[in-house]
């Protein structure tokens, strides 16, 4: 079996199968200026079948991004504003009595959609957060005695405002670990902001067109898992994750007292999956070290627990990941 020929064939196949990525990107660029990192991560989440936790101040096109993506693939979109008085039933649905039928009927909640924007997830109590996170994990919801499967594709993008912390309920570490990525989004640059301004003044506001069907995304996910991961790349992934747990073994002794707990095995799996999806988006049939480095921060930043000492010295998980990537030998 000639591996070289196999990889060449796989590469050609991926190039064919991933052509829709350009169509989606083109459509989304009509309505969203800048925010390339966020849009790319949304696509990775969609293709790797994982959910995204987004951190950024209000007004950075988070709602518009996921709504536009849903429209381009003809999927159902639902926005849930999390508030302190929200109940799990407001999210999942409930049994209501129908006088006409003289029986209880199911009224499904907003979680029954392909794309969910869970806005300011840290504003709702733990009971509501865990109801959403359970739906994310199980891909099904139980109302009364009946269990209902959620539609595929199913992507949750939860947002957190990094500034307002009053009246918030921080997500527990175990819950945060369920997110494939935590993406931190920044302000647009000056040129992008001018374009946003012009776009709002222009009366001919552009809208996205539907260029794909949900089933095509489901099919693409199977292809993403076929993207080739060499053993050297697997070793590179495990070394990066293990360095968050045992920094001293990787010449990172200075972080021994800074890290309270390292990334879980889920991080290893997700690092591989996101790298495969990233390679797919770049129209490549194999993963290279640069793919791992490109997604490492998003996959690991919410999975490293810092000690009080790290916080006192203003050491962030980003600093630790940067140091790990600079220290671990690239294959």
Where are each of the predicted segments found?
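Conserved C-terminal "switch" segment of AAA+ ATPases
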Residues: 13-18, 31, 168, 182-255, ...
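Conserved alpha-helical scaffold flanking the Walker A/P-loop in AAA+ ATPase domains
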Residues: 41-44, 97-117
């Amino acid at each position: 079996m000639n591996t070289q020929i196999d990889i060449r064939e796989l590469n050609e196949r991926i190039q064919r199968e991933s052509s829709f990525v350009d169509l989606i990107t083109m459509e989304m660029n009509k309505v969203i200026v800048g925010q390339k990192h966020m849009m790319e991560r949304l696509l990775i989440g969609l293709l790797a079948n994982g959910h995204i936790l987004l951190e950024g101040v209000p007004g950075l096109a988070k709602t518009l991004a996921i709504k536009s993506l849903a429209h381009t693939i003809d999927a159902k979109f639902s926005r849930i504003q999390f508030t302190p008085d929200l109940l799990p039933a407001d999210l999942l649905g409930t049994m209501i009595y129908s006088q006409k039928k003289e029986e209880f009927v199911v009224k499904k909640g907003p979680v029954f959609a392909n794309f969910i924007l869970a806005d300011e997830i840290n504003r709702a109590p733990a009971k509501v957060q865990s109801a959403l996170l359970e739906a994310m994990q199980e891909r099904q919801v139980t109302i009364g005695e009946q269990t209902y499967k959620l539609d595929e594709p199913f992507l949750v993008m939860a947002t957190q405002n990094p500034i307002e912390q009053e009246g918030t309920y921080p997500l527990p570490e175990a819950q945060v670990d369920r997110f494939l990525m935590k993406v931190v989004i920044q302000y647009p640059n000056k040129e992008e902001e001018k374009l946003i301004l012009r776009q709002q003044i222009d009366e001919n506001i552009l809208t996205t067109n539907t260029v794909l069907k949900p089933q095509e995304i489901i099919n693409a996910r199977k292809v993403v898992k076929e993207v080739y991961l060499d053993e050297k790349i697997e070793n590179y992934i495990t070394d990066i994750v293990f360095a968050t747990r045992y920094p001293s073994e990787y010449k990172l002794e200075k972080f021994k007292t800074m890290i309270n707990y390292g990334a879980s095995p889920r991080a290893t799996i997700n690092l591989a999956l996101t790298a495969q999806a990233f390679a797919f988006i770049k129209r490549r049939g194999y993963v290279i070290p640069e793919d791992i480095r490109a997604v490492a921060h998003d996959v690991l930043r919410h999975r490293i627990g810092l000690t009080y000492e790290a916080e006192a010295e203003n050491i962030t998980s980003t600093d630790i990941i940067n140091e790990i990537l600079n220290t671990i030998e690239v294959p």
